[in-house]
Amino acid sequence: YGGRVSSVLDIYQKEGNSNEFHANGGIGIVSSRLLVEGPLKKEKGSFLLGGRASYAHLFLPLFDVDNIAYFYDLNTILSYNLNQNNNIYLSVYFGRDVFSLNDSFENTYGNTVLNFRWNHLFSDKLFSNLSLIYSDYYYGLNLDFVGFDWNSGIRNFNLKYDFKHYLTNKIKLQYGLNSIYHKFNPGEIEPSTSTSGINPQKLIDKYALENALYFDVEHQLTDNLTASYGLRYSNFLRLGQDELNVYENDQAVIFNDELQIYEKAEPIGTEEFDRSDVIKSFNNLEPRLALAYQLNNKSSLKASYNRMTQYLHLLSNTSSPTPLDVWTPSGTYAKPQILDQYAVGYFRNFSNNMYSLEFETFYKTVQNRIDYIDGADLIANDAIEQVILNGRARAYGLELLLRKNEGQFTGWLAYTLSKSEQQTEGRSGNEAGINNGDWYNTPFDKTHDISFTGSYELNKKWSFNANFLFQTGQPVTYPNGQYEFNGIRIPSYTNRNEFRLPTYHRLDISANYTPKPNKTKGFRAVSSTHLRAHETNN
């Protein structure tokens, strides 16, 4: 994997049943789901169609609740066996999440994904997957209180060709290539009413091409020691069809010595690029190494190092009164983020694998972490470079995971103790930097994160589930006053992310009942109760 400096979620889609038709679903208080599957041609092809939707927003007005939140998604996959060595797959996903607050604004976001994959078996030791992927991420805000709608997004056209090669029973190779064409919509504004004083505005689309070659080796060195090592080469081209501002000394942000704050620089000109022009290019090597040593048949140790590069930046100004996400490519002013991560872990199982315990500690650093000047405005800003600076970040902590894998009661308990900080120092001795150049909490810092999931099977008809989540509140920055300069009122802030939102914890329980477990396959009635939510810090 590559292209991201945070976690990657690896999802495998379930294939439909190619022999017989099945349907199952669940009806809940706040949401329901349905999944149907069956053969397209017996033992040759299959289909799977699944959908989910929530409907709590239909009942909230009955309780005088103005806030609305709901989601819906649809997932389908078609598979067909051409012959003994070739299989093809077509999958489609569409999903939306909607949240509105007191009729003031509505936030809608979601993804559309189309994926065609060809699986080819060269021999019993070599096979490949060729994938063509289209994705469309949408993010929109309806701001009725100011009279306009705003949306942004990113479309990706992705080609992947991956190989798995079993050289021997001790050496397995994975190698391949990846090429992604990105089209960014930085923002578009439309008046939401006929009486709105807002003029329509569409920012210029941005384009980029991201390429990668990689190989990875899984090597069993001894009976107890296994090594995974590899190298990924990545290349990123920021493409043209754009008009870029030119600044004195290439600085789009300047430091005001008198006020001790960062401000937007005035452009001294513009430079135009054609669609075929390369505005900026980047190249990076990303090595990775992981070692696993089995102490005995119950326990093992592991250690790893990896470097990753992320060329896309998610701009999200958490100090803004409205939520906002804008994707932007690396370029002259937004440098690629480069991650170096180290981890050491220990694993042990107990009572013939009935219980297992995992422990891991980690430390990672990120170069070129995006930071924002005070008062940064991301909505319809065609000069984003005027409100961002390149800094750095670090995160460290430990994770514990305890599982119970067998018996009437199964589940897991996870705990993470961590620290996530960032720093943006001054570019010269005359600049104070963001937050006086000191380390401060990132918006994602959560000192404590506890989650519990448990399932108890009373009998074949009845089962009970519980989910508990506890998280330290998100860091926030509050203004502590204002001052006037040349007739302009300027807010004064405390140190960045010095305060926190209330601690968040919730408990959800559900009872599942299957009326005729041996006759009615897949039918399940579900009731769920939400017991706890936010709690104010003392």
Question: What are the roles of these predicted feature ranges?
Answer:
Residues 529-536:
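Conserved small/polar residues in nucleotide/adenosyl-binding loops
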Residues 44-47, 85-88, 124-128, 170-173, ...:
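Repeated loop/turn-to-beta-strand initiation elements of outer-membrane beta-barrel proteins
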Residues 1-20, 34, 38:
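N-terminal periplasmic accessory domains that precede
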